Protein backbone atom coordinates (compact mmCIF):
# COMPACT_ATOMS: atom_id res chain seq x y z
CA UNK A 1 0.00 0.00 0.00
CA UNK A 2 1.37 3.37 -1.10
CA UNK A 3 0.20 6.98 -0.99
CA UNK A 4 1.31 10.59 -1.18
CA UNK A 5 4.34 10.47 -3.43
CA UNK A 6 3.73 14.06 -4.58
CA UNK A 7 5.83 13.55 -7.72
CA UNK A 8 9.00 12.55 -5.80
CA UNK A 9 9.52 9.62 -8.15
CA UNK A 10 13.00 8.76 -6.82
CA UNK A 11 11.33 7.30 -3.73
CA UNK A 12 9.93 4.52 -5.91
CA UNK A 13 13.47 3.19 -6.35
CA UNK A 14 13.50 2.16 -2.68
CA UNK A 15 10.66 -0.27 -3.33
CA UNK A 16 12.04 -2.08 -6.35
CA UNK A 17 13.39 -5.02 -4.35
CA UNK A 18 10.05 -5.88 -2.77
CA UNK A 19 8.31 -9.04 -3.95
CA UNK A 20 4.69 -7.95 -4.40
CA UNK A 21 1.77 -9.14 -6.52
CA UNK A 22 -0.06 -5.82 -6.64
CA UNK A 23 0.48 -2.15 -5.81
CA UNK A 24 -2.46 -0.29 -4.27
CA UNK A 25 -1.88 3.47 -4.43
CA UNK A 26 -4.09 5.67 -2.26
CA UNK A 27 -3.83 9.02 -4.00
CA UNK A 28 -1.63 12.10 -4.36
CA UNK A 29 0.75 10.50 -6.82
CA UNK A 30 1.25 14.03 -8.09
CA UNK A 31 1.64 17.48 -6.57
CA UNK A 32 -0.71 19.46 -8.77
CA UNK A 33 1.22 20.84 -11.69
CA UNK A 34 0.61 19.82 -15.29
CA UNK A 35 0.58 16.69 -17.41
CA UNK A 36 4.23 17.35 -18.25
CA UNK A 37 5.33 17.57 -14.60
CA UNK A 38 3.21 14.54 -13.65
CA UNK A 39 4.30 12.26 -16.48
CA UNK A 40 7.62 11.01 -14.97
CA UNK A 41 6.05 9.79 -11.71
CA UNK A 42 3.10 8.14 -13.48
CA UNK A 43 5.29 6.17 -15.86
CA UNK A 44 7.79 5.31 -13.10
CA UNK A 45 4.97 3.82 -11.02
CA UNK A 46 3.64 1.93 -14.02
CA UNK A 47 7.10 0.50 -14.68
CA UNK A 48 7.48 -0.95 -11.17
CA UNK A 49 6.40 -4.39 -12.39
CA UNK A 50 3.30 -5.44 -10.44
CA UNK A 51 -0.12 -4.25 -11.60
CA UNK A 52 -1.12 -0.92 -10.05
CA UNK A 53 -4.58 0.09 -8.88
CA UNK A 54 -4.91 3.70 -7.83
CA UNK A 55 -7.40 6.22 -6.50
CA UNK A 56 -6.88 9.92 -7.16
CA UNK A 57 -5.97 12.29 -4.36
CA UNK A 58 -6.78 15.94 -3.89
CA UNK A 59 -3.55 17.00 -5.63
CA UNK A 60 -4.07 14.71 -8.65
CA UNK A 61 -5.69 16.92 -11.26
CA UNK A 62 -8.78 15.43 -12.88
CA UNK A 63 -8.25 17.39 -16.08
CA UNK A 64 -5.32 15.15 -17.07
CA UNK A 65 -4.77 12.18 -14.73
CA UNK A 66 -7.41 9.78 -16.15
CA UNK A 67 -5.78 9.77 -19.58
CA UNK A 68 -2.22 9.94 -18.26
CA UNK A 69 -2.68 7.05 -15.85
CA UNK A 70 -4.28 4.91 -18.52
CA UNK A 71 -1.29 5.58 -20.79
CA UNK A 72 1.08 4.65 -17.93
CA UNK A 73 -0.74 1.35 -17.35
CA UNK A 74 -2.34 2.35 -14.04
CA UNK A 75 -5.89 1.19 -13.29
CA UNK A 76 -7.90 3.95 -11.64
CA UNK A 77 -10.62 2.97 -9.17
CA UNK A 78 -12.86 5.94 -8.50
CA UNK A 79 -16.44 5.06 -7.76
CA UNK A 80 -15.78 1.63 -9.23
CA UNK A 81 -14.88 -1.95 -8.31
CA UNK A 82 -12.48 -4.70 -9.34
CA UNK A 83 -12.53 -8.45 -8.73
CA UNK A 84 -9.12 -10.13 -8.72
CA UNK A 85 -9.48 -13.86 -8.05
CA UNK A 86 -11.11 -14.01 -4.62
CA UNK A 87 -10.21 -10.44 -3.62
CA UNK A 88 -12.58 -7.57 -4.33
CA UNK A 89 -11.45 -3.95 -4.45
CA UNK A 90 -13.51 -0.77 -4.44
CA UNK A 91 -12.17 2.74 -4.62
CA UNK A 92 -13.09 6.37 -4.05
CA UNK A 93 -10.53 9.10 -4.50
CA UNK A 94 -10.38 12.77 -3.65
CA UNK A 95 -11.74 14.27 -0.46
CA UNK A 96 -14.86 15.84 0.94
CA UNK A 97 -15.21 19.54 0.20
CA UNK A 98 -15.46 21.52 3.42
CA UNK A 99 -16.55 24.49 1.34
CA UNK A 100 -19.44 23.60 -0.99
CA UNK A 101 -18.14 26.15 -3.50
CA UNK A 102 -15.34 23.69 -4.28
CA UNK A 103 -17.78 21.09 -5.58
CA UNK A 104 -17.53 20.76 -9.34
CA UNK A 105 -14.00 22.18 -9.40
CA UNK A 106 -12.69 21.43 -12.91
CA UNK A 107 -9.29 20.17 -11.73
CA UNK A 108 -9.83 18.71 -8.26
CA UNK A 109 -11.48 15.55 -6.97
CA UNK A 110 -13.89 17.00 -4.41
CA UNK A 111 -17.21 15.50 -3.36
CA UNK A 112 -19.92 16.08 -0.78
CA UNK A 113 -19.77 13.81 2.25
CA UNK A 114 -23.35 12.64 1.72
CA UNK A 115 -22.25 11.13 -1.61
CA UNK A 116 -19.72 8.80 -0.01
CA UNK A 117 -21.96 6.20 1.63
CA UNK A 118 -24.30 5.43 -1.30
CA UNK A 119 -21.47 5.39 -3.82
CA UNK A 120 -19.32 2.97 -1.83
CA UNK A 121 -22.32 0.83 -0.86
CA UNK A 122 -23.17 0.38 -4.54
CA UNK A 123 -19.58 -0.60 -5.35
CA UNK A 124 -19.46 -2.91 -2.34
CA UNK A 125 -22.47 -4.85 -3.59
CA UNK A 126 -20.53 -5.58 -6.78
CA UNK A 127 -17.86 -7.48 -4.80
CA UNK A 128 -20.20 -9.06 -2.24
CA UNK A 129 -19.07 -12.59 -3.16
CA UNK A 130 -15.35 -11.91 -2.71
CA UNK A 131 -13.54 -13.74 0.07
CA UNK A 132 -11.63 -10.56 0.98
CA UNK A 133 -13.08 -7.08 0.45
CA UNK A 134 -10.69 -4.13 0.34
CA UNK A 135 -11.49 -0.42 0.09
CA UNK A 136 -9.04 2.16 -1.27
CA UNK A 137 -9.60 5.81 -0.44
CA UNK A 138 -7.44 8.88 -0.22
CA UNK A 139 -9.08 10.47 2.80
CA UNK A 140 -9.38 8.44 6.02
CA UNK A 141 -12.68 7.82 7.80
CA UNK A 142 -13.63 10.10 10.66
CA UNK A 143 -11.93 9.10 13.88
CA UNK A 144 -9.50 6.56 12.43
CA UNK A 145 -5.96 7.54 11.36
CA UNK A 146 -7.21 11.05 10.55
CA UNK A 147 -5.74 13.23 13.33
CA UNK A 148 -3.92 16.38 12.26
CA UNK A 149 -0.94 17.84 14.13
CA UNK A 150 -3.33 20.19 15.95
CA UNK A 151 -5.43 17.29 17.23
CA UNK A 152 -8.34 17.88 14.88
CA UNK A 153 -9.99 14.90 13.17
CA UNK A 154 -10.12 15.39 9.42
CA UNK A 155 -11.76 12.21 8.15
CA UNK A 156 -14.99 11.55 6.30
CA UNK A 157 -18.12 10.84 8.40
CA UNK A 158 -19.80 9.17 5.42
CA UNK A 159 -16.86 6.81 4.96
CA UNK A 160 -16.97 5.87 8.63
CA UNK A 161 -20.70 5.08 8.45
CA UNK A 162 -20.07 2.90 5.40
CA UNK A 163 -17.35 0.95 7.20
CA UNK A 164 -19.50 0.52 10.30
CA UNK A 165 -22.44 -0.82 8.30
CA UNK A 166 -20.75 -2.86 5.55
CA UNK A 167 -17.65 -4.08 7.41
CA UNK A 168 -15.18 -4.73 4.58
CA UNK A 169 -12.04 -6.48 5.73
CA UNK A 170 -9.53 -3.70 5.06
CA UNK A 171 -9.39 -0.01 4.17
CA UNK A 172 -6.18 1.54 2.85
CA UNK A 173 -5.85 5.33 2.83
CA UNK A 174 -3.38 8.20 3.04
CA UNK A 175 -3.85 11.99 2.86
CA UNK A 176 -3.16 12.83 6.53
CA UNK A 177 0.61 12.43 6.50
CA UNK A 178 1.00 12.66 10.28
CA UNK A 179 -1.59 9.93 10.99
CA UNK A 180 0.24 6.88 9.68
CA UNK A 181 -0.76 3.67 11.41
CA UNK A 182 -3.60 1.24 11.94
CA UNK A 183 -6.88 1.11 13.85
CA UNK A 184 -10.20 -0.74 13.80
CA UNK A 185 -13.75 0.26 12.96
CA UNK A 186 -15.67 -2.78 14.08
CA UNK A 187 -13.76 -5.63 12.46
CA UNK A 188 -12.53 -3.51 9.52
CA UNK A 189 -8.81 -2.71 9.67
CA UNK A 190 -8.08 0.89 8.73
CA UNK A 191 -4.50 1.47 7.57
CA UNK A 192 -3.07 4.89 6.76
CA UNK A 193 -0.07 3.71 4.77
CA UNK A 194 2.01 6.86 5.26
CA UNK A 195 3.72 9.40 3.05
CA UNK A 196 5.80 7.80 0.32
CA UNK A 197 7.50 11.14 -0.27
CA UNK A 198 9.26 10.39 3.05
CA UNK A 199 9.93 6.76 2.14
CA UNK A 200 6.99 5.30 4.07
CA UNK A 201 4.66 2.52 2.92
CA UNK A 202 2.78 -0.56 4.12
CA UNK A 203 3.31 -4.17 3.07
CA UNK A 204 0.06 -6.14 3.11
CA UNK A 205 -0.11 -9.94 3.00
CA UNK A 206 -3.49 -11.55 2.38
CA UNK A 207 -4.05 -15.19 3.23
CA UNK A 208 -6.38 -16.76 5.76
CA UNK A 209 -5.66 -13.59 7.74
CA UNK A 210 -4.45 -10.14 6.73
CA UNK A 211 -1.03 -9.02 7.98
CA UNK A 212 0.21 -5.43 7.81
CA UNK A 213 3.86 -4.41 8.06
CA UNK A 214 4.76 -0.74 8.09
CA UNK A 215 7.97 -0.21 6.14
CA UNK A 216 10.26 2.79 5.81
CA UNK A 217 12.06 5.19 8.10
CA UNK A 218 9.40 5.25 10.84
CA UNK A 219 8.71 1.49 10.84
Predicted segments, located by residue:
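Active-site environment of divalent metal-dependent phosphoester hydrolases
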Residues: 6-11, 30-35, 58-66, 81, ...
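Conserved catalytic scaffold of divalent metal-dependent phosphoesterases
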Residues: 7, 60-61, 66-154, 158
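Core catalytic region of metal-dependent phosphoesterases/phosphodiesterases
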Residues: 7-84
Amino acid sequence: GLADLHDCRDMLDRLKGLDTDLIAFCGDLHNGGSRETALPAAFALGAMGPPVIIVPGNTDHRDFVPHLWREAGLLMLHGSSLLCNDIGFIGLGGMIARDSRRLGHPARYYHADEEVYPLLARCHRQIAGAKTRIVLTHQPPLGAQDTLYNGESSGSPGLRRFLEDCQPHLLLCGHIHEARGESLIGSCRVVNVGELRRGLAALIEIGEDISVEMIGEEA
